[in-house]
Amino acid sequence: MQYSFTEKKRIRKSFAKRPIVHQVPFLLATQLESFSTFLQADTSSTQRKPEGLQAAFTSVFPIVSHNGFARLEFVSYMLSPPAFNIKECQQRGLTYCSALRAKVRLVLLDKESPSKPVVKEVKEQEVYMGEIPLMTPTGSFVINGTERVIVSQLHRSPGVFFEHDKGKTHSSGKLLFSARIIPYRGSWLDFEFDPKDVLYFRVDRRRKMPVTILLKAIGLTPEQILANFFVFDNFTLMPEGAQMEFVPERLRGEVARFDITDRDGNVIVQKDKRINAKHIRDLDNAKTKFISVPEDYLLGRVLAKNVVDGDTGEVIANANDEITETVLEKLRESKIKDIQTLYTNDLDQGPYISSTLRIDETADKMAARIAIYRMMRPGEPPTEEAVEALFNRLFYSEDAYDLSKVGRMKFNRRVGRDEIVGPMTLQDDDILATIKILVELRNGKGEVDDIDHLGNRRVRCVGELAENQFRAGLVRVERAVKERLGQAESENLMPHDLINSKPISSAIREFFGSSQLSQFMDQTNPLSEITHKRRVSALGPGGLTRERAGFEVRDVHPTHYGRVCPIETPEGPNIGLINSLALYAHLNEYGFLETPYRKVVDSKVTDQIDYLSAIEEGRYVIAQANAAVAEDGSLTDELVSSREAGETLMVTPDRIQYMDVAPSQIVSVAASLIPFLEHDDANRALMGSNMQRQAVPCLRPEKAVVGTGIERTVAVDSGTTVQAFRGGVVDYVDAGRMVIRVNDDEAAAGETGVDIYNLIKYTRSNQNTNINQRPIVKVGDIVSRGDVLADGASTDLGELALGQNMLVAFMPWNGYNFEDSILISEKVVADDRYTSIHIEELNVVARDTKLGPEEITRDISNLAEVQLGRLDESGIVYIGAEVEAGDVLVGKVTPKGETQLTPEEKLLRAIFGEKASDVKDTSLRVPSGMSGTVIDVQVFTREGIQRDKRAQQIIDDELKRYRLDLNDQLRIVEGDAFQRLARMLDGKVANGGPKKLAKGTKIEQAYLQDLDHYHWFDIRLADEEAAAQLEAIKDSIEQKRHQFDLAFEEKRKKLTQGDELPPGVLKMVKVYLAVKRRLQPGDKMAGRHGNKGVVSKIVPIEDMPYMADGRPADVVLNPLGVPSRMNVGQVLEVHLGWAAKGLGWRIGEMLQRQAKIAELREFLTKIYNESGRAEELDSFTDDEIVELAKNLREGVPFATPVFDGATEEEMSRALDLAFPDDIAKNLGMTPSKNQVRLYDGRTGEMFERTVTVGYMHYLKLHHLVDDKMHARSTGPYSLVTQQPLGGKAQFGGQRFGEMEVWALEAYGASYVLQEMLTVKSDDVTGRTKVYENLVKGDHVIDAGMPESFNVLVKEIRSLGIDIDLDRN
């Protein structure tokens, strides 16, 4: 096995029993692939597939004018590079996007041309079509400076669906069948039976009409309709009775209404006997062709065709008429011999279409279409053209109706056709086929569809959602262009005069900015980012709504297996509607979810991997990943547990066709991070996977000692870490930048082989957590492509590290862990284990008001010197200042209107001048409850406004930093190029050169070192190829210099141009505060198994329970939290974590006593290779073994993959290896080594029972008490009720509700109650009086009338009751 540079530093010991047969795919692939398909930016315009933007353009263009003499054709489109990079967009609050330009061609035809159209003029031009937001390399979008994610939508696939109402509609419980044809866009067509078995149709859920109206409208006559749905019985009328053609299976099961005889007159079936199989056989044997029937047998039957008198041409009876005695008489009079009737019975041939035809009053095709027109457009007079146009537009027009590729495929498959391609509009035979299947369902043949089957639900990804929006915008443009095309020739217009890009821009902007599926990215930690991008929602436009979604839609379905995670979904109203993709799931070309399986041939597992969708999967027998497999790949068990069509069964190996690729295949990323998931109850696992997403990144991330082996994949795929683009040697490292000198074989010829990585330092995430990258390589390290070079937030040596490993003891402690409370040692806080940094962004804007512009300044009256001391001369706080709540960050004054002055004020003005009173202080202050350090300030100034000193200084600093960066890059690039040159020139023969280099001399290193580097290029070489190479390197350096100069100029231009600010804003200042949050009582914490709680007390280290060797516990948890919750995984994690730490301590002890490398190797081999997946430690050098051992001192990380984890024996073996008997005795461990004797820290006495102790990875969640604690003295009041507002955001008060009032009443505290309900709430006059009294030093309350009483009076008056307050 190949280990990467980072993996070698710390190997995770895996207990997996199965080899890796299929790597976990790139976790963000769905988003990135979908959007790149939408843009097709890197494909040349001629080779673009009809997908995404290309499809939208080609579906709307060409646009033809109303008179047909002008048309606008689409040629191609191109995307220009974005004006600002991602970081600049985030800083300036811009959208990271690219301008879309389309090349269109205006073709004008000659109106005078008599016969065929002749092209008179062609104008081609590039037209601006708006801006398209671009996806960042990590799958998000930057919209107005914030990162957003477009969530994929799970919606009903287009196609045809058959269902019944489960007997809920009608009181009798009768099943009413219905069918629905759903197009991708266009009108829905529904067919439904009513309780009387009449078949109706409706368009777009409007009024229902008999289905035969639709059949007539598509051109069928009643005869054709009946011929399509029924088989006919043939009768020949005889002078006495009639003869019926004998069809055996039609008679079976019926009761004979007369004696049935054979040709010789022998009675085979007696009257009133049921006809059975033997009777049919006898009739067959007698070679019966016809049966004589009495005349009354015909009565009540229905004619299948119109009956016409052969002589006169008169219609005697119509198709679908019932045969009565009158009709029979007429038939005999007209000498009609042969008639056909419909064959129906009560079991499997109902008369439904015939009954429907009977209630249908329309006569012919036109009448039927008029009826449909009246239903669609009630009140409008139907003209023939309008009627035809509406009907054709409903289902037959490509503009208005699109079944889509998926819809056509699903439709054809459902109606049993072989080919899966066809027209995208509805055809007549499609409607007929649908009705036929529906009638067959009513007749008891076939099955209804399961709507929740993942073969009937498909995923719309970013690309598709964006394409739909773009098309909607284009269609709006098309309408406008059609209007103007008529004038194109007369006014000599160009294409850009015709096209207005506003509708497209607004459609795209609305979608990315405010659509339900465009969400503010959850950026708490790398896992929450990745999960958000892999989320699949059933809500959103065109999807379900929370209120209407029933239990079935939300429930886990057998087809979710390997496609959608059965565990991870939110608790609350969205449960089951928002899901997560499973680990290996993947979208196919139609948008259906697929999952990989290994092919099994003749009971042998092969290496072939096939992706199957839910529809295909139903046809195979699939074994689970944990089926026993021999060395040669054959299945060894006699019976293998497998799945077929959603059912679990035990089958013999020869029936198995596929096998799962991995046990973790069925769960999502978050669930696959929970060790021992198989031992947790599903409800708790759900909480565990949701809470991992809320873990706040700690100051020093620490890897989980017990993991599942997928941590590295998550960290790398999330994009939080920095990966090497190309391999090479680390040349330079500091906290903010790394430089790698690329390997010769990876650097393209003539190119400078240097990669420079600038790290993200202390940046604010969407959730105000801190994003910071730290290098994990040192100068001289050799790295290869894809290696992790720097850790990001919540990653440790390239692995996800959401929390900290805590020494946990399960025991009660003085009631402080009652009801899931958590007891924490002071040492945890002192060591900053759970300290996190949060970055708050505070904004202030200076606007242009009616009374004059607001000003950002240091010159503010009534401000203490302490406050002013933090501001620079521009009135903006210094970086590095430590600020508390209420401190001024940016000084700002606003002009205020002239007010009526009191005599005292006039006097003051006369003495002290005007300035102070005509402005009011509106400075930006630190909000209540917040304190921290200023880490960054940004000043944005509108174009044309003079920049202040601070803004100019920020620009200068930025340019200086950029110039240094470029100089460093150039130095490294040149150094690298000259190193390569020295290697190349060494020993080459020269034709001459500087310092009188003679022709034919061999160049030596000493000569080169004496020479100035730039003179090396003056050496003339004999070898032409080498000379060309020398020239190429010289050109490349010159080019790089030129490139850097251009880049610097570009940067300067960007920084010095004015900023785009909202209208009316002159200046904007953003101040970033870093807030340090230590762990404190009230913070929420959790493990990974749904074991959550709130910190109740932080206990001094000397009071914590401790072991025999004096080691105190970090966390004390309540043991009662485990049995009822059934999340036993946490207990197993604690045991394995204990073993992991113990092994680390033993390795640390070996390193301390400088044990021999051989001993170290032997011990590591025992750890890694005695069970589970073996590691190739022999391939490591001694230095690498020592480095590995050093990184293992704090615990050997274990991986216990989901559903394939460590067994009890393996855990016991690990514990025995970690704690030999002598060590175990010193620690006071029990003989089984899974519990420890603990001592009470306060009394020093041993606790009565042994306690389960070990290491658990514990997280601090983003529900911090600092963000929730809030107090108010005075603040804003509600406008109508005059009561204080509620909530921290409004700086509101505490609600004194109904039950609190009861409590005070119960105590008889009448004065307190009066105070609460009046002056502390909504008694306006009373409030001011209290203030006046306090100023006077008189602590008296004058309670008056609460404002809510007046509100009540007004409310009653608004109901028309005259009520007035008697104030006497």
UniProtKB/Swiss-Prot annotation:
InterPro entries in alphabetical order: DNA-dir_RNA_pol_bsu_ext_1_sf, DNA-dir_RNA_pol_bsu_external_1, DNA-dir_RNA_pol_su2, DNA-dir_RNAP_su2_dom, DNA-dir_RNAP_su2_hyb_sf, RNA_pol_bsu_bac, RNA_pol_bsu_CS, RNA_pol_bsu_protrusion
One annotated Gene Ontology cellular component of this protein: DNA-directed RNA polymerase complex
A Pfam family recorded for this sequence: RNA_pol_Rpb2_3
GO molecular function terms listed in the Swiss-Prot or TrEMBL record: DNA binding; DNA-directed RNA polymerase activity; ribonucleoside binding
UniProt-listed Enzyme Commission number(s): 2.7.7.6
Gene3D superfamilies given in the database record: 2.40.50.100, 2.40.50.150, 3.90.1100.10, DNA-directed RNA polymerase, beta subunit, external 1 domain, DNA-directed RNA polymerase, subunit 2, domain 6, RNA polymerase alpha subunit dimerisation domain, RNA polymerase Rpb2, domain 2
Keywords (A to Z) from UniProt: DNA-directed RNA polymerase, Nucleotidyltransferase, Transcription, Transferase
Enzyme class: transferase
GO biological process, one term: DNA-templated transcription
Known catalytic reactions: RNA(n) + a ribonucleoside 5'-triphosphate = RNA(n+1) + diphosphate
Family: Belongs to the RNA polymerase beta chain family.
PANTHER family recorded: DNA-DIRECTED RNA POLYMERASE I SUBUNIT 2
Function: DNA-dependent RNA polymerase catalyzes the transcription of DNA into RNA using the four ribonucleoside triphosphates as substrates.
Assembly with partners or alone: The RNAP catalytic core consists of 2 alpha, 1 beta, 1 beta' and 1 omega subunit. When a sigma factor is associated with the core the holoenzyme is formed, which can initiate transcription.
The protein's name: DNA-directed RNA polymerase subunit beta
Organism the protein comes from: Paraburkholderia phytofirmans (strain DSM 17436 / LMG 22146 / PsJN) (Burkholderia phytofirmans)
Taxonomic lineage: Bacteria, Pseudomonadati, Pseudomonadota, Betaproteobacteria, Burkholderiales
The gene coding this protein: rpoB
